[in-house]
Design a protein with these regions (language model features):
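Leu/Val/Ala/Ile-rich N-terminal alpha-helices, chiefly Sec-type signal peptides and the beginnings
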Residues: 1-29, 34-36
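Generic amphipathic alpha-helical segments used as scaffolds and interaction surfaces in large
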Residues: 10, 23-26, 44, 87, ...
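Long, charge-patterned amphipathic interaction tracts in eukaryotic proteins
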Residues: 15, 25, 33-99
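Short, well-ordered helical secondary-structure segments
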Residues: 15-19, 44, 144, 151
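Helix-driven interaction modules
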Residues: 71-168
Length: 177
């Protein structure tokens, strides 16, 4: 929990200003996977759990941007995107990912969490609607570096979107642990 809050510039007894500076330096030099691994076992209703889900989606996009972008475009043109009202007003996927990158590099604050989590949840729902194999796992290969319970469950994108929406709601009312 301390590293997740420190990422947002919120120190505690474990993270004084110097420790915050070092963490941000680690993140800016490619240390996000190391820190994100610490969050992988955290429940979805906590900040580290939500950040873990942000990290996984962002990594999938950076690894396979064409596939994710194609599914996003297909989803935008789907007859229905479960969980989103019509008409769909969605930001460009690249902008949503840019915000995720900024969040995970320590450039955002806790006031930004609700919007970022909500936008990422919308993006996940849109990508899921663009996938003709609805109900499939997000990551199919158990040896994939992104293969975790979150990504290998049936309907992973929709379920992860729901979890991020819950985290956004908790962030809005100041109850995100």
């Amino acid at each position: 929990h301390s590293t997740a809050w420190a990422l947002l510039g919120v120190g505690d007894e474990d993270f004084d200003p110097e420790a915050l500076r070092r963490l941000r330096e680690l993140l800016s030099t490619g240390g996000v996977p190391l820190v994100a691994e610490l969050w992988s076992q955290s429940p979805d209703f906590t900040l580290p759990g939500a950040l873990w889900r942000v990290y996984l989606f962002r990594e999938w996009f950076h690894r396979d941007p064409l596939t994710v972008a194609d599914l996003y475009i297909l989803g935008l043109h789907a007859e229905q995107v479960p969980g989103l009202e019509e008409p769909i007003h969605a930001r460009p996927l690249e902008d949503v990912i840019h915000d995720a990158d900024a969040l995970l590099s320590g450039e955002k604050r806790d006031d930004d969490l609700e919007d970022i989590f909500t936008e990422l949840a919308h993006a996940m729902r849109i990508v899921a609607a663009g996938d003709p194999r609805v109900g499939r796992q997000w990551i199919d290969d158990p040896h994939d570096a992104l293969a975790y319970g979150v990504t290998m469950r049936a309907r992973a994108l929709v379920m992860t979107a729901q979890e991020l929406e819950r985290a956004a709601s908790r962030a809005r009312i100041g109850e995100l642990d």
